[in-house]
């Protein structure tokens, strides 16, 4: 007897058969293997491989009209590490990777980007017209999940978080309607989609305001010895406070342990988004620290995004928190990381794993123009001081270590949260795109925004399709 999910796939095969991939087919295997994290490769009963908004609409109408519930997941790039957010076992996964085009209209200065595109291809297309949009700092990241979660970029200090550059959406709603959404036509839904993740529908096109690029930018990766950490941490906190004085500069700091070398080092991603020939003044304190090696040069955003790409083929977990910008928080994160390394050495069964504590500035300049652009639901306007996002990014090769690494990542974040609360440095905001499966980023947006999300969901999805049937990700009804 066929299972419910198999019956759902059979119905899809009738309504949109040329867009369905079943187990054992080449298309099915290619889709399953293309997730960033191996542990995210949950095998569905079938994949839907749409090429248009109409394909998505037919699929949604089919899935929501069956006598038994058809559970489904939605993926664009498959880069999320929150289990089940973009995949489902024994259900239906809608893989948007075939919807991957980018076009640019110079008359309106608008980039039209489909959700299955990767940021590398987006940049490659837009740079032909000497324009860009704020997007992923890693070439392989998909557009859809990135933009519906808000997202930071190389250009955040100049143009705001990436979602704020969205002028309009094409979205398939719960009843299958293909709707055009902007600040004038659907102001509440427009706002809710900026940070609302997969709670309202399936976005099939993003209309983004572009900006002119001055050609090459300057940046790359710098490697420092861990012995420089005190000077490095001081440089990072000073840089964060200085961002308003030079919004072209961006910094990501990574304290990283790799089991294959048994070494902890400091990796730094620097970018200066206008042409310069050497270290800009904004990075002077990093320049003063002796480095082991670096790749700093004049390059394109595409070049840096390719360089920043992490290898596929590993298992992965993320946890994240937000804190006041101060050196003590980063120092505590390094202490926690060192203790985590000791635990991993004692308990890990695999020999190939990496533990990263990643530090990034979050400053009011990133969100200060939100309301003028239709608003968002991130709730960051509550905060007027400079913040840090610290993410625990762990990868490993042996499935026997899954629970250990999940436990360690969560423990690291909880320990830093506890320390931050005790020192008055804790901030309730949780960056959705880095949040772990045990976290609640929607509640971190603030209760007012959470209630707003509930009202918008009730209006545009009264039957709760994207709460009940799309169970993965961070859901409003579970916040």
From Swiss-Prot:
It comes from the Eukaryota. The modification Pros-8alpha-FAD histidine is found at residue 79. Coiled coil: none annotated. Keywords: FAD, Flavoprotein, Oxidoreductase. It is an enzyme of class 1 (oxidoreductase). Pathway: Secondary metabolite biosynthesis. Disulfide bonds: none annotated. One of its GO terms (molecular function) is oxidoreductase activity. PROSITE patterns: FAD_PCMH. InterPro entries: FAD-bd_PCMH, FAD-bd_PCMH-like_sf, FAD-bd_PCMH_sub2, FAD-linked_Oxidoreductase, Oxid_FAD_bind_N. Its EC number is 1.-.-.-. FAD-dependent monooxygenase; part of the gene cluster that mediates the biosynthesis of the polyenes aspernidgulenes. The carbon backbone of aspernidgulenes is synthesized by the HR-PKS sdgA, which accepts acetyl-CoA as the starter unit and performs malonyl-CoA extensions as well as regioselective methylation and reduction. The resulting nonaketide offloads the HR-PKS by intramolecular lactonization to yield the 5,6-dihydro-alpha-pyrone-containing hexaenoic acids preaspernidgulene A1 and A2. The FAD-dependent monooxygenase sdgC then installs the first epoxide on the penultimate double bond. Belongs to the oxygen-dependent FAD-linked oxidoreductase family. This is FAD-dependent monooxygenase sdcF.
